[in-house]
Curated annotation (Swiss-Prot):
One of its GO terms (molecular function) is rRNA binding. GO terms for cellular component: small ribosomal subunit. One of the primary rRNA binding proteins, it binds directly to 16S rRNA where it nucleates assembly of the head domain of the 30S subunit. Is located at the subunit interface close to the decoding center, probably blocks exit of the E-site tRNA. Keywords: Ribonucleoprotein, Ribosomal protein, RNA-binding, rRNA-binding, tRNA-binding. Part of the 30S ribosomal subunit. Contacts proteins S9 and S11. CDD domains: uS7_Bacteria. This is Small ribosomal subunit protein uS7. It comes from the Bacteria. Belongs to the universal ribosomal protein uS7 family. It comes from Bacillus mycoides (strain KBAB4). PROSITE patterns: RIBOSOMAL_S7 (PS00052).
Length: 156
């Protein structure tokens, strides 16, 4: 923990095309080896694929997808009297967004399509329709929280 108090949150700049901080955060989350330009190109091309496939604005589809991925509850380990309990806790709004973006990128990378643009586009489309691996991850997280509801009184 820092001795000089809490570390200030860095604010990201909105991206040039959609003027959205959320898109910038997704670009940063996808970035590998500091290649932000490449990450940006991949995302914008993926958004074009989304526009072609869904006949809707890609930002609308992306925001709906993210809404369907973001978890409300998660479990955190809490040690009580020599036993570890999985305690369900509510997820803070900032962490919800972060987890949603992380799961979207991770499960897009695991898909079978040929290019990352296609993988990301189809994962966004699937998530916006409440399908896909990222949405399944959210469902699994919620199931774990539901299964451990008995330990909710250990919250801190």
């Amino acid at each position: 923990m820092p001795r000089k108090g809490p570390v200030a949150k860095r604010d990201v700049l909105p991206d040039p095309m959609y003027n959205s901080k959320l898109v910038t955060r997704l670009i940063n989350k996808m970035m590998v080896d500091g290649k932000k330009g490449k990450s940006q190109t991949i995302l914008y091309n993926a958004f074009e694929i989304v526009r072609e496939r869904s006949d809707k604005e890609p930002m609308e589809v992306f925001e709906q997808a993210l809404k369907n991925i973001m978890p409300v509850l998660e479990v955190r380990a809490r040690r009580v009297g020599g036993a570890n309990y999985q305690v369900p806790v509510e997820v803070r709004p900032e962490r919800r967004t972060t987890l949603g973006l992380r799961w979207l990128v991770n499960y897009a990378r695991l898909r079978g399509e040929k290019t990352m643009e296609e993988r990301l586009a189809y994962e966004i489309l699937d998530a916006s329709n409440n399908a896909g691996a990222a949405v399944k991850k959210r469902e699994d997280t919620h199931k774990m929280a539901e299964a451990n509801k008995a330990f909710a009184h250990y919250r801190w």
